[in-house]
């Protein structure tokens, strides 16, 4: 037996020991604990607005912190800022690269960011003196596509990439201040903790990792999915997070228990998940699927509580407003829909 095989065997044994140790600590399951809680009942949401304006597949969307404005990115090479109350377009920003995969709204509302197959995170200033929107920074440093980005504040942004890394950037200098390495596959998604000191990432190595923003180190690694993790989202209290994967399941992982608490799946759901988001209370988990639907799960009981059906193609992105009053879904059918 070669040294490599021996090491592989040892690693496998260690993994099993860790799994057994975790099992020994888990004295109850979430299902048992939540058994006597009333089910949420049937969730029926209606489409309140349809945002029309993109001419091709929508790949990403992100709400502003005011719960009114949102940004969307499409294959048509446009970044559009929408007023969800009136359905008006506040800005339509032409992009240098139409191969965009992600977009983000800064908490201040002053900036938006986007990126994709150009490997660059482009920052746009919405509040210039002249009133026009222009590129204020292009953050180049990743050697693979940009899959996700999220602002910490007006001068810091975290990005994830197909080069298997995540990075923290100083926008003013345009430099990576921290690189987060450890995944062995393309990093597909990231989510900031409510206090922005930590973030989680999901990758094509089927694992999720918890990172310390300031120290640049991986705190925890979570396994369980059988295929690529496409989407990840923190639980509102910051103690857990949900993932969505090509294995047709969503899962809930707890930071303190250091393991998976729940799987959200159904025999007749056989397609991958593209996006996940929690309701404001955390009781509902919304997930967008390749089969054109968005399923609403009871996060505590893993029952399907509702379906948002209204798109004619894959639901590629979704988001719940900060005030918890509305959900937006974006699709390859080129439309965004606002539900509540």
UniProtKB/Swiss-Prot annotation:
Domain of life: Eukaryota
UniProt modified residues of type N-acetylserine: 2
Residues recorded as bearing Phosphohistidine in the entry: 266
Matching Pfam families: WD40_Gbeta
The entry's keywords: Acetylation, Phosphoprotein, Repeat, Transducer, WD repeat
Disulfide links within the chain: none
Entry-annotated residues carrying Phosphoserine: 2
InterPro entries: G-protein_beta_WD-40_rep, Gprotein_B, Guanine_nucleotide-bd_bsu, WD40/YVTN_repeat-like_dom_sf, WD40_repeat_CS, WD40_repeat_dom_sf, WD40_rpt
This protein's record includes keyword Acetylation: yes
Post-translational modification (record): Phosphorylation at His-266 by NDKB contributes to G protein activation by increasing the high energetic phosphate transfer onto GDP.
A GO biological-process term: signal transduction
WD repeats: 46-94, 95-140, 141-181, 182-223, 224-267, 268-309, 310-340
Function as written in the Swiss-Prot or TrEMBL entry: Guanine nucleotide-binding proteins (G proteins) are involved as a modulator or transducer in various transmembrane signaling systems. The beta and gamma chains are required for the GTPase activity, for replacement of GDP by GTP, and for G protein-effector interaction.
Family of the protein in this entry: Belongs to the WD repeat G protein beta family.
Subunit structure: G proteins are composed of 3 units, alpha, beta and gamma. The heterodimer formed by GNB1 and GNG2 interacts with ARHGEF5. The heterodimer formed by GNB1 and GNG2 interacts with GRK2. Forms a complex with GNAO1 and GNG3. Interacts with ARHGEF18 and RASD2. Forms complexes with TAS2R14 and G-proteins; these complexes play a role in the perception of bitterness. Component of the TAS2R14-GNAI1 complex, consisting of TAS2R14, GNAI1, GNB1 and GNG2. Component of the TAS2R14-GNAT3 complex, consisting of TAS2R14, GNAT3, GNB1 and GNG2.
Protein name: Guanine nucleotide-binding protein G(I)/G(S)/G(T) subunit beta-1
Native source species: Pongo abelii
